[in-house]
Structures are given as structure tokens and as C-alpha cells.
Amino acid sequence: MSERKLFTSESVSEGHPDKIADQISDAILDAVLSQDPDAHVAAETAVYTGSVHVFGEISTTAYVDINRVVRDTIAEIGYTNTEYGFSAETVGVHPSLVEQSPDIAQGVNEALEVRGNADQDPLDLIGAGDQGLMFGFAVDETPELMPLPISLSHKLVRRLAELRKSGEISYLRPDAKSQVTVEYDENDHPVRVDTVVISTQHDPEATNEEIHRDVIEKVIKAVIPAQYLDDKTKFFINPTGRFVIGGPQGDSGLTGRKIIVDTYGGYARHGGGAFSGKDATKVDRSASYAARYIAKNIVAAGLAKKAEVQLAYAIGVAQPVSVRIDTFGTGIVAESKLQEAVRQIFDLRPAGIIQMLDLKRPIYRQTAAYGHMGRTDIDLPWEKTDKVQALKEHLA
């Protein structure tokens, strides 16, 4: 009998407390970048019942009305009713942002490679904003080259938000979570969905029966291809029996607490650094995007069915200290040759990544819910496959 394996990933909606915090942090980043593309930003947010605290470091010439950005973001998510215990108009906003440390700025603004060197490459000017390791991943399980469990999990909570905002399911409230368990065959190909868990906040009048019916018919069956569902697929819809109190009234939220949701749902490794609220000189963010860009182009080029890319940096140094590629035995060329090609084709210095992916633009708020990778609903530069031909030619 062939061996079957299960793998599970989860996602959360834009109304989840941690995701509210991520979206506020990225909305502040976008507001700053729209005026000052060269700003350095590290904006953290904490949310809880009736209160939002924004803190961190910013170096910029821009003026941003933090209070307005916070309230507008909360309203766009859907927290406009005081019954939710957290409302855009009544929430208390407490900003506490200071200037970036000059010790850090020294290494970011002038990388080790150019200090005391008159003959300098402009792209060597920016050093990494911190040490660290970052991962990117791609696999041919879905058209967007993402693992199927996280792809479906994101689509489920995004569908809930669409139905809530359109009014088609009027009793839905903003907070929600999804979880999908996929069964794989002995060749690591997804064959069916074993279990779907959805917890969605709702008005008190909604019955469990109508929630169960609507979620299965209008969410699960609308999102998950019929080929993956069978009579053995298990559905757990609001398994606690009631989910009226939610959002920051139910749990506090912090920026950067959903890093696995933001990436590959646990299917690939993670370096530990969060994304939201950070400008692109922070390699936690920009190098993770670059690593995804590399991995996706490798798989799109047919050079491997699965690819994981690790990049690592030293603070204040432009060039990565290491580049590693793992194709898990699915590659058609040696990994050493892939690594050589990647170093030739992709500029992995922070300034090179920023230029390559055009990361000084205010594009980040849209990434702060429903995943930073594999998005098909928005246009993100690290999701392009425009290096496929260059990789093929280099390795020919």
C-alpha cells in the first residue's frame, strides 16, 4: 500500500488582531514612502480592546498623520461598529515613534564595502539593516507555485471577507481563521483535501446551522476545486459553537506575529524576521522577497519542481554572506550551478534588491493580509517570472 502523508497550513483574515496590527504598520510605511521614498521605517503596532499603540523608529522628511492612517485602516478592514469593542472612530490611538539609531544608520547609509573607498559602486552604498537569514520557496503544486495548503487557506479567508464586505452574508464580522489539511501521495503530489477548519466571527443572531451551510456552500465549495473534495473530507465550522466576541476585543494583536501565515504556511523554512512596518533596507523583508523571486523563477524555468533559497547577511555589509539553494532532489542541474547562476543574474545587495524589485514604492499595505507570497489578486514584483530566460541561457 502506498504511503500517504498529511500537511496542514492556516491563514487568518484581515480582521484578525495580529493582522490589524500588520496592516496599520504597513499603512504607516506606505504613507511615509509616498512622500519620502528614501525613508527608513520600523513601525510596530499593538492593538487591544479600544486602543492602538504605534511605536518604533522612523527617519524621514515626511509628515504623516498617524492618527488618521490608523483610523482609516481600521475602517477599511470593517471595524466601524462600536458593538465590536473596537471601532475606527472611537479607538484610542497612541503614537510613539522616534528617530532611527545613528549607530544603525551609519552601517545602512554607508556599507562596509565603500567605507574609505573612493572608487565605489553606487549599489554598494547601502548595507544590510541587520544580520539575519531569509528563505524563499516555490513548488509546482499550484499555478502560482505555492504549496496547496497555504494557498487554499488564504483563499478561504479572503472569500469570507469578500462575502462580508459585499453584504452577501450579512451576519459576518471581520475576524476569521482558516486551516486546510492536504493529503499527499508517495511522490509528494497533493491528491485530496482531508480537513477544512473555518472559524468566523458573526452577529449574535446567526445560527450555527446557517453559518455551517453558508460557509460550506459559499466559501469552501467556491474556493476549493471539486477534485480535492470527497465524501471523506471533514469540515469543522466554528467548532467552539459561538464566535461573537472577536478581533481586539477577544485577543490583543501585535505586528509580526503571523510570519508563517505571511509566507509558506510552514511548508518551507523561515528565518524568523517579520515583514510589516519595515522599509526595504531591512533585509528581513526585502531579502525574503528576493529569495521568493529567485525560487519562483527557478521552478517556472523548469529547473526544479521545488526550490528553497536561503540568503544571509551581516549588518552594515552589502553582499550576502551566503546563498544556498536546495531543490530536494527535483532539480535537473546541480545546485552549485544554480547558485552560481543566481549570483550572476540576481543582484542580492540591499540596494540591488531595492532597484531590481522597485521596492521604494508604497505597495506594502496590500501585502499585510492574505500572504506576501503567491498572490494572484495583486501585482507584486517578486512574483514575476521575468528571469526564466536568463536562467535557462546561463545554464544551457
Curated annotation (Swiss-Prot):
**A GO biological process held by the record:** one-carbon metabolic process
Q: What's an example of a GO molecular-function annotation for this chain?
A: magnesium ion binding
Q: Where are the transmembrane segments?
A: none
- Asked whether the UniProt record includes Magnesium among its keywords, one would answer yes
Q: Does the keyword ATP-binding apply?
A: yes
Coarsely, its chief localization is: cytoplasm
| Residues bound to K(+) | 44
Keywords, ordered alphabetically: ATP-binding, Cytoplasm, Magnesium, Metal-binding, Nucleotide-binding, One-carbon metabolism, Potassium, Transferase
Pathway, per record = Amino-acid biosynthesis; S-adenosyl-L-methionine biosynthesis; S-adenosyl-L-methionine from L-methionine: step 1/1
* Residues that coordinate or bind ATP: 16, 175-177, 242-243, 251, 257-258, 274, 278
Enzyme Commission (EC) number? 2.5.1.6
Family label: Belongs to the AdoMet synthase family.
Name the NCBIfam families for this protein.
metK
Protein name (database record): S-adenosylmethionine synthase
Q: Which organism is it from?
A: Streptococcus gordonii (strain Challis / ATCC 35105 / BCRC 15272 / CH1 / DL1 / V288)
